[in-house]
C-alpha cells in the first residue's frame, strides 16, 4: 500500500518542485512544549550620552587645529622677526631725522634774529628822513588849518603904553588921528601921533613945525583924548 501511494504521488508532482522530505504526521504525544522567555528590551540610551561622543570629536578637531597652528607659528615668527629687524634701522633713522629737524630749526632761529636786527636798523635809518619831512608838512598844515587867534579887545584904560602906541599907529588912514596928552622927561606934550620909528614915537604938536621924536621908554603916561 505504501509503495502504491508513493508512485501515485510521484506521478502527480510537477517537473519543477522543491524536494521535501517525507515525514510522518506528528501526534500531540510526540510534541514537546518549549517555553522561551524573551528578555525585556532595554530602553534606548538617552541622547545626552551621545553628545559626549560628538563633543569629543569637536575637541579632537580643535586640538588638531591648535597643533597645526602651533606648527605654523614657528615658521611665521622668523618672518615677523626678520621684518621687525628690517624695520628697526628704518625707525632709528626716522627718529634721528626727527631729532635733527628741530635742532636745525632752532639753529636757524638762533642765527636769523641778528640778521633781522641788522636789516631793521638800516630800514629804520632809511625811514627816518622820510618821516621828518612828513612831520614838517603836517606841522605846516596844522598851522595853516589852525584858525587865527582872536584878539581880545581891551579898553583903553587897561592898555599899557606900548599897546596904546601900537593901537594908535596901526589905525587905518581914513580914520582921523586922535589927539593925545603925553608926559615924557618931565614935560607934557599935546599932539597927534603920526608914526613910529624903531623905539621912538613921532608926535606932531599943534604947531606947524616938524614932528617931535620921543623915546618910548621915556614916556611915563599917554592919554588919548576923545576915547
Curated annotation (Swiss-Prot):
The keyword RNA-binding does not apply. InterPro entries: Spore_coat_CotO (IPR025439). Residues 35-60, 85-100, 108-147 have a biased composition (Basic and acidic residues). Keywords: Sporulation. Pfam families: Spore_coat_CotO (PF14153). Largely but not entirely controlled by CotE. Has an important morphogenetic role. Involved in the assembly of at least five coat proteins, including CotB, CotG, CotS, CotSA and CotW. Required for appearance of a morphologically normal outer coat. To a large degree, CotO and CotH act at a late stage of coat assembly from within the outer coat to direct maturation of this structure. This is Spore coat protein O. It comes from Bacillus subtilis (strain 168).
